């Protein structure tokens, strides 16, 4: 689950990480009141969406008068903000963060993620923070320092000080940087985050260390023990189909292609999408019905896929281990009739009750295209989507 910048800063504040004073605003009037409450002479008007790259996309503006606050708030609120993380369709801006300006002397970068290789927590930091951190990672990776943290030990004073010095924090500000780094680590660990990022972490002209931005992503599997995090959820930022899918315990992610995919198991789902692309097709979604799919779940899965007007064909790829092929066949038949299926449907089933499932499909009278291997299924669905 993602949250907005201003919500991330609320979390950082609780963990004693210095952040600028700021007030969220949902209208131009609220933006002006926020600016007045903060006082001048400089404010930053920041679009709040669940995506990075807002500055380059025109979603962050520095205002030096109340008139500029009004102009920028009017322009940004309601705009369709396009960044490298939103896709070409962009995201609509429904809320702003009005923040006091800061005297930026140096921009740094720091983030925490779960490192799957070491099965520990990785802290990454760089002296080159700001809007071009992706370029730094791509072209000068030596400027990014990584520290693997043992969770039972945490981020020690010595390690925090060492990282701070490596990214160019002067001795006079190292203690402040240590406080910020350890606060970020504690926030990451105690909230079950999967990502915590400050970009930039700034040094001001008078030597202060301040988190000028905050990005958090949380492990959805741990949200049951964090109602305070769930309260931050903004459904307007989420795909409506993905929200609907979660109600039926379906793992669904919208994509840009024209071939709907219904698969059991995340690994098989990814392999299926790769195979579709191998034969020149483009998946319209990732959809994992899991190991306990019912007829109802399969029907809802079909409804979700067909809500996408770009879908020209559907591939059902099932490995019947825990999931029986006859149950999937029953669901496919029921779903096809319930949604009045009007696009080609390719079905490939292997495993438990495979022959029974195939017979049920063959006897259904529905125009279902059968396939024996994943490669054959991918080739057939790509051809069907192309009208061949």
From Swiss-Prot:
EC number: 6.2.1.5
UniProt-annotated binding residues for substrate: 264, 321-323
Keyword flag Calcium: no
UniProt domain ATP-grasp: residue ranges: 9-244
Reaction(s) this enzyme catalyzes, per UniProt: succinate + ATP + CoA = succinyl-CoA + ADP + phosphate; GTP + succinate + CoA = succinyl-CoA + GDP + phosphate
This protein's UniProt keywords: ATP-binding, Ligase, Magnesium, Metal-binding, Nucleotide-binding, Tricarboxylic acid cycle
Pfam family of the protein (one): Ligase_CoA
Record-listed ATP binding positions: 46, 53-55, 99, 102, 107
Cofactor remark from the record: Binds 1 Mg(2+) ion per subunit.
Needed cofactors: Mg(2+)
InterPro entries in the record: ATP-grasp, ATP-grasp_succ-CoA_synth-type, ATP_grasp_subdomain_1, Succ-CoA_synthase_bsu_CS, SUCC_ACL_C, Succ_CoA_ligase-like_bsu, Succinyl-CoA_synth-like
Cross-referenced Gene3D superfamilies: ATP-grasp fold, A domain (3.30.1490.20), ATP-grasp fold, B domain (3.30.470.20), Succinyl-CoA synthetase domains (3.40.50.261)
UniProt pathway annotation: Carbohydrate metabolism; tricarboxylic acid cycle; succinate from succinyl-CoA (ligase route): step 1/1
Claim: NADP is one of the keywords in the record: no
Function: Succinyl-CoA synthetase functions in the citric acid cycle (TCA), coupling the hydrolysis of succinyl-CoA to the synthesis of either ATP or GTP and thus represents the only step of substrate-level phosphorylation in the TCA. The beta subunit provides nucleotide specificity of the enzyme and binds the substrate succinate, while the binding sites for coenzyme A and phosphate are found in the alpha subunit.
PANTHER family, A to Z: SUCCINATE--COA LIGASE [GDP-FORMING] SUBUNIT BETA, MITOCHONDRIAL (PTHR11815:SF10), SUCCINYL-COA SYNTHETASE BETA CHAIN (PTHR11815)
This protein's name: Succinate--CoA ligase [ADP-forming] subunit beta
